[in-house]
Amino acid sequence: MGAMDDRRYSYPPPRTSYVQPSTHPSPTASDYRYRSPVLPQHPPTHHSPSSYSASLYGQPKEDPAIAYARMREEMRTAEEARREAEALEYRRKRDMEFAARRPGSELMDDPRRIPHSSFPRSQMYGPSADQSRVMPSRNGKDYISEPPSPSELYPTDEDTERLPIDRYRRDIDVPPLPRQLPPPPSEIGRMADRARSPSAPIAPPLLKVVRKRTKVIRPNDFLVGNEDVWEDGLIRYQSKREDEVRAIAQWAASCQVRNGVGEPSLPQTQDESIKVRKINGDIATPTNKKKRKSRKLNLDDELLGLASSPPGSPNAAAEAEKSESKHHIYGMNGPIDPANPPSPSTIVYPSGLTRAEVIAKCEAGDVEGLTEDDVKAVQDEMWMREKAAQAAENGGVLPTNKDGTVRRKPGPAKGWRKIRGIDKKKETTPGKAQSTTAGSVAGSVADEEAEADIAALLDDSIAKKGKKVKRRKLEEPGAESPRFADAEDEYNEHRPSDSVLLDEIEDEHSRAGSVGESNALDTLPAASAPPKKKNSKTKEPGVGKGRWTRPTKPEKELVKKAEALASRTSKASLAGPSDDTFGVGPGPAEEVQEEIKHEYAPNTHDPRGVSENEAKIRHELVEDLQKQAWSNIVRDVPRIYRVFQGYDQSMKQIAQRRAQACVRNAFGQRNQKTMQRQSGKVNKEGAAKAKRIVKELAAFWRKNEKDEVIARKKAEREALERAKAEEEARETKRQSRKLNFLLTQTELYSHFIGKKIKTKEAEAAEGMDVEEEEKRGMEEIAIGEDGEPLPDLDYDEDDEENLRKHAARGAQAAIQAARDKARAFDDSIVGRGAPLPGDDTMDGDELNFQNPSLGENSVTITQPKMLMAQLKEYQLKGLTWLGNLYEQGINGILADEMGLGKTIQSISLLAYLAEHHNLWGPFLVIAPASTLHNWQQELARFVPRLKALPYWGSPKDRETLRKIWSRKNQTFSEDSPFHILITSYQLAVQDEKYLQGMKWQYMILDEAQAIKSSSSARWKSLLSLHCRNRLLLTGTPIQNSMHELWALLHFIMPQLFDSHEEFAEWFSKDIESSSGGVTGNLKPEQLKRLHMILKPFMLRRVKKHVQKELGDKIEIDLLVDLSQRQREIYKALRQRVSITDLLATAENNTDNGNPKNMRSLVNLVMQFRKVCNHPDLFERADVVSPFVFGEFSQSGNLAREGDGMYLPDSARNAIEVQIPRILWTDGGKLDIPGEQSLAGSDTKILQNLLNIWTPEWINERTKCADAEFGFVKLVGSSPGETSRSAKSPVLVQLLEGAEKERRWTEEGRFVDDSEFAASVKKGFRVPSVIPVLTQPGQVSLREISRRVWDESYLSRDDARCIGDYAIAPIVKPIASNRSFLNAQDRILNQPLAHSTLYGLAPSELHDPLAAEQFSRIAPSVPLTGLIPSSASSQTPVSPLHIPPTKRLIVDSAKLARLDSLLRELKAGGHRVLLYFQMTKMMDLIEEYLIFRQYKYLRLDGSSPIAERRDMVTSWQTNPDIFVFCLSTRAGGLGINLTAADTVIFYDHDWNPSSDAQAMDRAHRVGQTKQVTVYRLVARGTIEERILQMARGKKDIQDVVVGTKSVSDVAKPSEIVSLFMDDEELAESVAKRKQAEAHGYIAPTIIPNGRRSQFGDGLVLDDGEGDDGFFNAAAAARANAEEEEGLGAEEESKGKGKAKAAAAVTFPVPGEKRSHKKGMGKKAQAAAAAAALERVIAGNEEPLAASKPPAKKKVKIALGPDGLPL
């Protein structure tokens, strides 16, 4: 592309073409822009490399590389010659064009002239652009390589005088003035405009006007570069600009007034001078100086003339030439070389003074007229002089850097702040003499250039984006305001391009060129630049990174006003002379001044002199050139590719020939075949040996690397293990210290609180041993009275004393916090106007940790008088304990065993507070939904003076109730509308925001195990309620783990029990492992400390210690064997369980295992539990029937109705036939009257004429031969009897026939015709009355056969086969007519036939009148009908098969045992509570109870609250109810069922606390009978092991609460052991010993990727019995639903998910599976048994299974009998 760009300039100028004229501001001129057509492109003259191939071939001895290099050199030389020729041709053409367009003629008269205005030159067009671009030249000189001389740039006087008056001014008569000072070109342009107007007289060619202050454009604004794009328009524009520049330069040079010595007219800036010196090599370019990157310009902006360039000297070329020729006179600013300092006569720019003069002015403090660059140029030399003087005084040592160089002065110029102060003094002092050059144009330019750096802008227009420009606030309020660039508004930016030069000079301030002075800006108040807040981080104007900056928006507004004021001031200055300028003569000059004041139209062109249309044209030209370039590239690429392809082929041929020549020269004429035969054998052996050596080396190094890796890994592993062991030892020691600290702190707190509230005395009872507390003196606490600060607590140190002091202080803080909280609550109650409680016994202030012996000050409470009951001794102690809790302001847990009266004790506490402390509320009681009514009844019964408000029901009802208790600022007294609010847990969570608005005196949580999960929303919501004290009532404080105990303890004392991790570190792991039979490290002293910590907060008594009159509780386990059907299904499940998969699942389901695997395992457990309960839970033996094509209506319960139920009309065919109307109503039926019918004609026509069954017709036809009624004579019937029989119904015919046969049998003669008698059917035959003669005492044969048939299975209804696979009712016609429906019903349902078949109705059987009437209608038919009286074999087979009810009992062993047990209990007068885990099992039991006709009640999670209350009341009051069916979770909480004396658990819970609560519903206070508890357990199944696991959990509770010591309790370590019975375990152990005797070692099973998990094939439908043991979240949701009556417990949530367990699939283990070659099935079983034994024994962790082969999925299909097929 570079060659193509250079080549474009060598072509002759093409023909130009006009385009659309652009808008011009002058109304009389039309402006045409020229655009260049597409230039023709010559193909490049590349020399193909193939042209040199011939010469290469002719010189075989010459190196091809040398030839190719020579070829490339020749090509490069030819290309350079061509470029030089093109450049010379271009320069010649440009000289001719410039000569043809002189400014004297064409510039003035051309109507298409481009408006003149000064704009900065683009960077891309300047000398700093790409140097390969050919620049225009003039007079044979290139501006880049050879700068023009001053004579070429500065016009002569003759050229100046030839400048015409501006054509935009009207002509005026101006007398010639003395030529003292030439006018600026702007004034000349205005005069020329007036001279061209038709009415104006001829004006002299030159008008000399002098302005006091003005600004000039830069002389170096050439628009050069890419002239072939813009063509003639750009050429004329450039010619005009060059002429204007010459005129301005000459005029400015002649305006030098009072110049200083050696002061140049237009000095260079410091940057330009340094740049020239760097080019000339005078100074070295520093390498460590970071230069700021300039902003890159867009090519489109450059071509459109919208790019700006940094300012430069107006005559940069001339000054560059002068600098080059006279460098010794006009030296450049730059760094000082201490070894070779600059001459004092060197000129300093931009001031133009010598270095000596500048230094003298700076030292004298007179820096007027100097800029920052001037001061910077000499500051180093001044600093060195000063340091040299100091060094002379100190011994001649200059300050140097570390590298030995002389240190320079850093920072800005020394006199810069002085300059700012002097400028201010200069501007503010009236009458002070101005600068010597202030009155001249050149002086103005020089001053403006000097002030440009001083008034540099605050914002840098080319600064990096995002870089913050630091600014400095002016020190004095009257300081000089900064100048801003680009501050013109849109009006000034779009002024006409042909406006006078004065306006252009005024607009100069708004561009990125030279910025001069502005009196308007100087006279603005200092407020125009608002002061910054931080002076230390701001910079003064002109000290920024860029030379010119851009002002902010507020500053732009000020500059706009300043520019307008400056314009008016500048114009006004032309009206009269001043002291520093030559005056203008009177007369016409005044008119000129008036014209100068004229306001011109706004500018509408681009600021650079390019209009919008011209910019569009330029943009189109750019696009055309780009398209042309790309088209040339696309055209030339294939050709160049072919050229280089040919060159490549030629080079390949040369290389090939050269190789062939080398081969020929190397071997010569020797016989190559002989050498090959001799070397073949050697090469073959050498190759083999080399391969073997390489293989051995590779093997050696592989082994070596492997050994190194193994050794390195071993060393790293050992180092890691050592580091881990050390870290574990440190962490163990640290945790031990932390545990000791926490225990000490809690012990001190518990010790004091326990003595205050007397927990020990409350627990003491007859027959109960209470351990003496260890005396602990307060001297051990070591808390100083002075309160000196203790050292920081560090658990890594061994300072036990410091730990104990911190623990004591922490306990004291906790006590103080409890005291402050209670006091604050009481103060808030008093502040609301509540009555002061009688706090005679309250000693909150005495709660001092330093005085622990306050036992004598504790409160002794008697029974309240308002309590309408007599408390027992242990209950009164419990009331005293609760009262002391309130007195001390702490919370507690009343954990008495279920049935000891926790409710009455809490009620008595509320009565005590109301009676002794005058605290009538508000109290909040939260209980499960099933006990809400019980609480309401107990409060109304025992404390009628306390008003209880039940808060439950619909949202609307609760909103009404809230109006009662949620009043603001209400006080509570005996007359208050309520005292106690009773609600459930679910409603408390829902209405939390309302309950938080009240401050409750006491909050009582009944059955507090409902908040055992600290992560539940219920726990968090209740913890946030505002209450003074909390009391938790629970019979089982320990549920599943110690985590639940921590949740309760944190709820009552969050200050101490604030971290569950710490609590678990204390006790959880040790106690749980100890109760599980695993060796734990729970020490007796730790257990003792745990009891001591829990004792003050928890009061627990058991029944055997405190209630002597309460009857005993006997628990009996009833072990049953599975039925045949259960055994088959259980065996089928076991066969599909692999022991290997069992162990793998156990290994994967650790605490951090996969939850999906855990869910699969638990689901498999639930399948086994279903089998043990009842096989119908898998698939119910449903009613079986053929496919019926029809619809059925709703019917009753088929199981209850029995086999005699028959609904013939319940079925209806899906096909319906619509009868046309004409067939029934419009004459179709002869017996239906109508308008067009023939009613009455049926008697004549149908009954007589068309009836063949009339007696006359029969009699007539019997006389004819071959007549159809010939049989009448044979059967012995008369024509009348035959006619009557034909017209009678079928049933009447059958009855008459049966009666005739009976008479004939009884009265007729004997006929010896065996064949005829055998062929007669015996259906519906009436038993014979003829006596059968038999031997006396013998049974007749008929009776024997009947009895055998009745006792056989084939006689049963369920054994009779169904003949059809599909049946369909009859298709009934349909007509929309009432009479049609009545007739149809009368025909289908004949009363006579119905009565004969089914007999009389049950209500008419004993009615003599109905019996007599029935005998007349149907003689010899029993009153019960033919079907009930006939044998079962004669009745029609029913298509509906209903399973017998007895099968429901027989198929389940547990239900069969329950059936016999209930018979015994019913006979003994007992009443039974029957508990279940599954609601579907409760449905089956309901059918059984209905079958046995036992009266029962059912309560589960779906029972509403109101029904629960009614059911409990009915059970307690109605002794006729024998069985109460309950779910363990819904019916085992807080209800009193003491009317029962027997409890039966059909299946038991994972959680032993749930079963304990359930059985205590009957064994509680008020029970006078002995309570017997039965558990139905299937022997040898998973249920037996689940029961053992639950009892192991019960031991945790006993260990924690102190009723049992640490001991080994039998518990399986893994759930896997649940699936193996004792026999299998013993057999596995024997096989393991046998395998070990043969040398077998059990393999290590390593997990490999994703295995087929245990129970993957099962349908994850654990709705039946997922009681939440493994899923705490599901259990919590189930509890919530049960409590609120929102649905059944967790097992009911699975309804509808899985229809039957017959579709459950299981993985089938592969037949070919062995972990070791030659290992058989017995060895595998022995190995698995050995591993399982080690797991159960706790000596080894369970091993994972290797990845088994793919398994098939099989489906268990159950047959009609319920057994697997």
UniProtKB/Swiss-Prot annotation:
Any coiled-coil regions, as ranges: 702-745
Record-level GO cellular component terms: Ino80 complex
The name this protein goes by in its record: Chromatin-remodeling ATPase INO80
Domain named DBINO: residues: 629-759
Organism of origin: Cryptococcus neoformans var. neoformans serotype D (strain B-3501A) (Filobasidiella neoformans)
Complexes and interactors: Component of the INO80 chromatin-remodeling complex.
Binding site for ATP: 896-903
Catalytic activity from the UniProt record: ATP + H2O = ADP + phosphate + H(+)
Residue ranges constituting the Helicase ATP-binding domain according to the UniProt record: 883-1055
Compositionally biased residues, Basic residues: 407-419
Database matches in Pfam families: DBINO (PF13892), Helicase_C (PF00271), SNF2-rel_dom (PF00176)
Short motif DEAQ box, span: 1006-1009
GO molecular function, one term: ATP hydrolysis activity
PANTHER family the UniProt entry points to: CHROMATIN-REMODELING ATPASE INO80, HELICASE SRCAP-RELATED
Family the UniProt entry places it in: Belongs to the SNF2/RAD54 helicase family.
Domain notes: The DBINO region is involved in binding to DNA.
Start and end residues of each Helicase C-terminal domain: 1457-1607
Keywords: Activator, ATP-binding, Coiled coil, DNA damage, DNA repair, DNA-binding, Hydrolase, Nucleotide-binding, Nucleus, Transcription, Transcription regulation
Biological process terms in GO annotation: DNA repair; DNA-templated transcription; regulation of macromolecule metabolic process
Subcellular location: Nucleus
UniProt keyword Transit peptide present: no
Xref: InterPro entries: DBINO, DEXQc_INO80, Helicase_ATP-bd, Helicase_C-like, INO80/SWR1_helicase, P-loop_NTPase, SNF2-like_sf, SNF2/RAD54-like_C
EC number: 3.6.4.-
Pro residues bias locations: 175-186
Top class in the EC scheme: hydrolase
